[in-house]
Amino acid sequence: MVEKRVQPLARDAMAYVLAGGRGSRLKELTDRRAKPAVYFGGKARIIDFALSNALNSGIRRIGVATQYKAHSLIRHMQRGWNFFRPERNESFDILPASQRVSETQWYEGTADAVYQNIDIIEDYGVEYMVILAGDHVYKMDYEWMLQQHVDSGADVTIGCLEVPRMEAVGFGVMHVNEKDEIIAFVEKPADPPPIPDKPDFALASMGIYVFHTKFLLDALRRDAADPNSSRDFGKDIIPYIVKNGKAVAHRFAKSCVRSDFEHEPYWRDVGTIDAYWQANIDLTAIVPELDIYDKSWPIWTYAEITPPAKFVHDDEDRRGSATSSVVSGDCIISGASLNNSLLFTGVRANSFSKLEGAVILPNVKIGRRAQLKNVVIDHGVVIPEGLVVGEDPKLDAKRFRRTESGICLITQPMIDKLDI
């Protein structure tokens, strides 16, 4: 791997995070919050991964565009990301849709969410722009991508995943030559074009783009003047550059931050209940593919002050215990047993209850003798005594949001409707 420059390019870059999406496939989890604000990994929010990657990469100027039900997201960032100092040439701006360009226009697409804040971007005076999605879980050093962008002379450099060809049908796919120059960009192709050196794989877009700032702003102004544009990077900006300029693919494996290089590069969309559950449960592995314990690349977040977790009772049938599980601060496991589960802060699990494959969001209370298997329980839910989930698929589907693979999402309104 080529060594980094003495003067990191990230110091002259701005990270612009697109965080306005709802994430409708997460169903009730995003009824009250945008997808980037959804809890993840015991104490963080999904957006913390993109923000932490930017900070750890050396980027000190960050803007976050918000729109859908942004209160929870904005409050989180105000609490957890308020340590940037202007006197050190650092800045962190939250950019809600505020009709800056038109008095009647909200963000119409991903490109428009950047275009409407062009004046703010120009004030930053940076050489490079790193456009990020705020709703993916991964660890990446953007400096490597910036270096490839400069060295290749590209107009845009696009972060890409190597995925099996038949799994790439749901992505925007790059058709590249031997130099990873993008020949064509195909949205959700039935027959994804293969990678030249790996014919069984395709290059799928991660929604990460690097531009020289001037080139990006010119492209956004041109796109805004096109009445037929949908104002979207993937649908409009990128295809135009591929056709009329130079676009280069950056392979995620080159910049993925990993503690164990025997693991495949870890990137997850977590856009469905199944994917969200699995990515959280992944963290309970002995050596998880996503290492949140790596102090050299921390996931920064709001550091809520909590007392330690506590496990009480040690009778034969009433023992507070946890195996292969992640248990956050302020949890009290009172005579309950957990296995292969992840608990956020403030969870109370009462006597004789059993949790298996459970992702429990903050401040949930679990009543005595509850039996919960393969569940995601939303913030603040009170689980009644004796509730059984994960044994009767038909009953679960009637009561809760049950996926085809058997994961049940449980919210308080669902509990309130139970006749038990």
UniProtKB/Swiss-Prot annotation:
* UniProt catalytic activity: alpha-D-glucose 1-phosphate + ATP + H(+) = ADP-alpha-D-glucose + diphosphate
Identify the residues that bind alpha-D-glucose 1-phosphate: Y107, G172, E187, K188, S205
What GO molecular-function term can you cite, just one? ATP binding
Origin superkingdom: Bacteria
Keyword check for Nucleotide-binding: yes
* Pathway membership: Glycan biosynthesis; glycogen biosynthesis
- Fetch the CDD domains from UniProt: ADP_Glucose_PP, LbH_G1P_AT_C
GO biological process terms, alphabetically, are: glycogen biosynthetic process
> What top-tier enzyme class does this entry carry?
transferase
Entry keywords, A to Z: ATP-binding, Carbohydrate metabolism, Glycogen biosynthesis, Glycogen metabolism, Nucleotide-binding, Nucleotidyltransferase, Transferase
Q: Report the EC number(s), separated by commas if there are several.
A: 2.7.7.27
Function of this protein? Involved in the biosynthesis of ADP-glucose, a building block required for the elongation reactions to produce glycogen. Catalyzes the reaction between ATP and alpha-D-glucose 1-phosphate (G1P) to produce pyrophosphate and ADP-Glc.
Family that this chain belongs to: Belongs to the bacterial/plant glucose-1-phosphate adenylyltransferase family.
Fill in the subunit field for this protein: Homotetramer.
| Protein name, entry field | Glucose-1-phosphate adenylyltransferase
Gene it is expressed from: glgC
